[in-house]
Amino acid sequence: MKPEEFEVYVIPPNFMEGGTLFGGLLKTRNTIEAVILGLAVGVPVLHLPFSLTVRVVILCLTALPLVLLALIGVSGMSLSAFIRLFFCFLHNRRILSRDGTQGGKNGKTLLPSWAQQKKSDCEAEDPPLPKSRSRFSVDLKQRSVTQFKTFLQEEEAVQPLNALADYIPIEKIEHGVIYTRDHRYVKVVEVVPVNFLLRSAREQRSIIYSFISYLKIAPVKVQFKALTKRADINRHLDTVRRELEHEQDPRCRVLQEDYLKLIRQLGSREAITRRFFLVFEYEPLPGTKRGHEEEDAIASLQTAARTAANYLRQCGNEVISPENEDDATAEILYNILCRKASSEPFYQRVKSVLADYMASGRDINAIPVNEFYAPDSIDLTHGNYLCVDGLYYAYLLVPSDGYKARVPAGWLSLLVNAGDGIDLDVFLARQPKDRMVRKLGQQLRINRSKIKETSDTNTDFDDLDGAIRSGYFLKDGLSNNEDFYYLNLLITVTAGSVDDLEWKVAEMKKLLLSQDMDVQTCSFCQEQAFLSSLPLVSLERQLYERSKRNVLTTGAASCYPFTSYEMCDDNGILLGVNKHNNSLIIVDIFDSRVYKNANIAILGTSGAGKTFTLQLMALRMRRKGIQVFIIAPLKGHEFHRACSNIGGQFISISPASQNCINIMEIRKADKSVDDLLDGPGAEKSLLAAKIQRLHTFFSLLIPDMSHEERQLLDDAMICTYGVKGITHDNASLEQPKNPGCYKEMPILGDLYEILAASPETKRLANILNRLVNGSARSFNQQTNVALDNKYIVLDISELTGDLLTVGMFVALDFVWDKAKENRTAEKAIFVDECWQLIGASSNRQAAESVLELAKTIRGYGGSLVCATQDLNDFFALDDGKYGKGIINNSKTKILLNLEEEEAQRVQGVLHLSEAELMEITHFERGSALISTNNNNIAVEIKCSQMEKELITTDRRELAELAQRAAPKQHPC
């Protein structure tokens, strides 16, 4: 197989259908029921005193439909089983409420049958021996089952305030383990997904093979749960509100309030989040001492969790390790059982429960754990759905014959990413290999004997042939060290109304039908499906039999579910919405625990939206209080509107501008943070450091400078500073009468006079004359702009030729000085059209300066964000040394639309797959591919109307802005 070919996996038909006739065409039970119904209705009809024709017509209208219905069955069940299920539903339908007053008809109990049995058993036993518990545990009554035996101090059992707490089949939570009422131990761990769909074929194969390794050593029964719901943006909103409180500039406060509105809008309409859980139960080993089973279960489950973390890490997944496992498990159950109420944080729910118990005078140390995540009401009176706290649930399952036989890796992404309110539960149960090999051999012999008696024109032939092929496939796999599993899929659909629920169910059926899959509604067994969907690895028996499908280890691994990657850092900035799963992309590039560095490279063709994306990020960083510098070598006017509207400082560096940053100025640096962190260090000469950077400046201005001239220039610069009383002693920088303030700095004109005075440096003076007395004399001034603003734009777009690289160096020199001032403060340097500085037309020393900035800015708590469009020029200088260096030192890359040639050029550098290459060449404006931490995410950039008006460069939109602004300026 070629590296870029995606592998196909096989999910064979069930090789063994017990109780079937005619090669699996009819089920034995259905056939018997059809015969009984046919005789029960047909015999009396045949004895009616009518003509034969009339009796045949009556038979066709009565017996025939019943016989066909019995043969076909209902929802995958026999007619008798369905009728029994229907009457059981009628008998058990009820409304469960918090106060316990609303039961079913005739005053039926609120508890399910298993709970009623447990209650009666407990009443029949000896008086209970109450036990103490931790915060998240409940009392266990004395029972004969020793696996729940504990040795804790006794205390009285507590009746919960919420009657539904008794409905949940959980006894307690201790040591991060769920103790169920049916005497099992269950562990739930949360798994961070990877962006599987945008991985290359080779990477996908690697993930699947690693997942195969895990499945082979995983517990016998595992459940994978994908929970989908509206994103909880409250923590991010709280962060934004705190930043708003600390903001002093009124114009920036307006921007922050606008950002809050945008987040709320996206959160209510589009933002979806997914959480993934791995659930497994304890399987006692033969010979385990029953008296120590609880201790063995806890140790075994904790070991299994660590093993899962190690193996899933090889797949690229991380298993979340909470500080308090009991709290984390309860929070997971809260989000599953109280979907509507879970918009309120779990700690608020805990406070509410504690307040209720205190108000009722109850002991808060004896609160049953189920109180913290029990819903307030469950309506079980409908056959096709149930209602929990006003939210409607419907359950679907994929029947045994509803699976595709050949599937790609990660095919469950279709269901995982289906949309808001669509949850998926995957159940895998490994079967004993010896027993399955024996059954396979028996069934193969039976099927081979049947097919010999069947004509190849018979409808049974294909079914038998498929069963035989499936049997041989499974047998070969088992002989090649694969394991045998039964796979079950249960789909949860939730909606705010019955109409929405029915629409979602219909759409899910269409979606699966389009993929050649079948799905059935769990009619009249919604309660069983609801309990099965809990993370307890407990699929109800009837649902299990209806939906089980045999798979080998490779087929089970193709169901790899952790495929919907999200980037949502509460302390970050919004970039947009994930195009594949509608999750919000909120990135905190300064979080060193997640990102090795904060650098970003933005690549795109002309008109793809590079400048728009760059400015959007800059505005949102400024909104967070981060120091922002923008260097604009082209079209600097595009940055002016946003800068002036948020209180920024716009500095134009050009011969025609009055603004000037003195290139020879030694700026005062705040070393207090360095002294606090590292202690007082050896003093370094600020003059020597400045002169070293000035040498780079003059090498840009005079590329053909000889070594002798460079030495003479060095002497002249030292002399120039000496005239101002500045030496290598840093104390000489300060004014004697005003300590803490620096002396007046020399300007280029002072250096020019010294160079012009010597014949040996006359040539250097003549070249420098352009910046002193010529057309570019604006460079020959003291700094006359405020350099302490939080948002500074350095416009060098009016510089051309050699002055462009000179101006770029002036800008970089300034921002580099500012970046070094405080290592603990976050700052971001944006360089638009970076190819101008490191491209073929640039100078190696200038390119080295940018590359050095990219390599070292991390050490000063900063970020370098480079945007470029001319990729050929970007990778031109020194065979792409500088372009590749910047790309390699940027942990995050944002790819906008690229032309075919540019995309192929960047494919090798970024290791893009063919699918990703195709995607970025077809991006529309506003779409991007974010590549970070080995995950590639297609995102739709989102901005508010205010942000769009501040940074748009589109001609039509600018014309509309000008039209709206005209009446304000000319009211008459």
Predicted features by range, described:
Residues 1-14:
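Short, charged cytosolic
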Residues 18-44, 170-174, 179, 212, ...:
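Glycine-rich phosphate-binding loop of nucleotide-binding enzymes
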Residues 49-64, 595:
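Hydrophobic alpha-helical transmembrane segments
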Residues 59-561:
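Extended, folded cores of ATP/NTP-driven motor/assembly subunits in large transport
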Residues 167, 172, 177-178, 183, ...:
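P-loop NTPase motor domains
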Residues 633, 852, 859-862, 867-874, ...:
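Conserved H-loop
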Residues 647-650, 881-895:
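A short helix-turn-beta junction within AAA+ P-loop NTPase domains corresponding to the substrate/partner-engaging
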Residues 912-966:
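Conserved P-loop NTPase
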